[in-house]
Amino acid sequence: MTTKNRTALVLAAVTMVVAVRAQQPAAGDAKLADAAVRGWFPKLAARTPLASRPEVEAVRNPKGEALGWIFRSDQIEPVVRGKRGEIGVWVALGADGMIRGVKVGVHREDKKWFDRIRAPFYKAFENRPADGSRGRPDAVTTATVSSRAMTDDVFGACRAVMGLPEVSERLAAAANGQSGKPAPTRK
């Protein structure tokens, strides 16, 4: 084998490894850092997984009251696919039933198009009812499939989480002006 052929073979192998690696989810995205969560819930003192759905975390203040929940949309059914696959969006759902914010986690969308989805689109989720009753953010031109998938995924995941017993009880209590303290445990 000549040096030229060997170089071409190595280059092809490296290209394949890079292409396969680009399709893999980003490492370290399994849990959102407390600093990011504090951006949505400044009084964060603890994060506790829900008993019924450990992938959904209750965000609690120093008194143990639930401020809301955080979860990644691609871990909650129904999962909506973008152009190239699932888009994992971190969602902060407040105890008042409003979306506090979203942050893109893992995705396999084309970087060229996905980068067109900017801060104004993400900000458009903030302070919207998680049930979608006050409309949804508009899709982004030139990234229509990805932005629509994100919107459908966020609101679909919110509806699923709001249907969980621990969450629906807290939302009902908040609607009635009651405290979000966890119920005392029986011995």
Segments predicted by a language model, with ranges:
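Bacterial N-terminal signal peptides that target proteins for export
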Residues: T2-L9
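Bacterial N-terminal signal peptides
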Residues: V10-V17
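Flexible, solvent-exposed loop/hinge segments and secondary-structure transition points
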Residues: A22-V140, T144-K187
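Accessible peptide chain termini
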Residues: M1, R21-A22
